[in-house]
Design a protein with these regions (language model features):
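Sec-dependent signal peptide recognition
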Residues: 2-8
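TPR-adjacent "capping" and linker segments in tetratricopeptide-repeat scaffold/adaptor proteins
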Residues: 21-22, 53-69
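Terminal, low-structured helical/coil segments at or just beyond the last alpha-helical repeat
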Residues: 56, 160-209
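Alpha-helical adaptor scaffolds
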Residues: 64-131, 136
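Register position in tetratricopeptide repeats
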Residues: 79, 113, 147-148, 180-184
Length: 209
């Protein structure tokens, strides 16, 4: 009986490892295609396939199916605006499976929608530790930095995403806008400094009071 149990356990471990290796191989091939896509439409087809893999728990068993169902349920709650319920559900998934990058990424999205930007960034950091190629998490990181008015960091996040996904539409659109915001901030700051300097002159002092 013990011998049979050992064979079953070894079989399950082998099956799990094969699935994990198969998943990794599929992602590697898709990321290669994503990086070498010649146009946006073909890149978006590859992107969709990557998301389909990310959103399914890596374990091809009953537990994995259940966690995938919970993630889908949480995403549905998030889309309905039930942010607190979604947050609690994603937190439960993370407690059960802390190594699943997409659980952290979806909770980061909820935290962003709840205006908890630093907490969202913390979850994104873990997401990227688990899946360094997660262009979605990098885009989310950029959005959080934008809300925090850290525009240079937002640009860096978008550029990091572009190294993985060169034709990423949001990065192409947002980087020029962010550069304009930085320039506007610099001009505004320069004017403020000039005005303050002018106020130090005795002739201008009364006008500044």
């Amino acid at each position: 009986m013990k011998k049979l149990l050992g064979i079953v356990v070894l079989g399950l471990l082998f099956f799990s490892n094969v699935n994990a290796e198969d998943r990794k191989n599929k992602l590697d091939k898709l990321f290669f295609k994503l990086k070498n896509s010649k146009n946006l439409s073909s890149a978006q087809i590859v992107e969709k396939k990557i998301w389909e893999i990310w959103l399914i728990h890596p374990s091809d068993d009953r537990r994995g199916f259940r966690l995938t169902e919970l993630l889908t349920q949480g995403s549905r709650l998030m889309n309905m605006g039930e942010l607190n319920k979604a947050y609690k559900l994603f937190t439960t998934i993370i407690a059960t499976e802390p190594d699943w990058s997409e659980a952290w990424n979806t909770r980061a999205t909820v935290l962003y929608l709840m205006d908890r930007f630093q907490s969202s960034l913390d979850d994104i950091k873990i997401t990227l530790t688990l899946e360094p190629r997660h262009f979605g998490a990098l885009s989310g990181q950029a959005l959080n930095y934008i809300e925090l008015k850290q525009y240079e960091k937002a640009i860096q996040s978008y550029k990091a995403a572009q190294k993985i996904y060169p034709l990423l539409d949001s990065a192409e659109k947002m980087i020029p806008e962010l550069k304009n915001l930085i320039n506007d901030q610099a001009i505004s700051l320069s004017k403020k400094i000039l005005n303050q300097h002018a106020c130090l002159q005795p002739a201008k002092l009364k006008q500044c009071i």
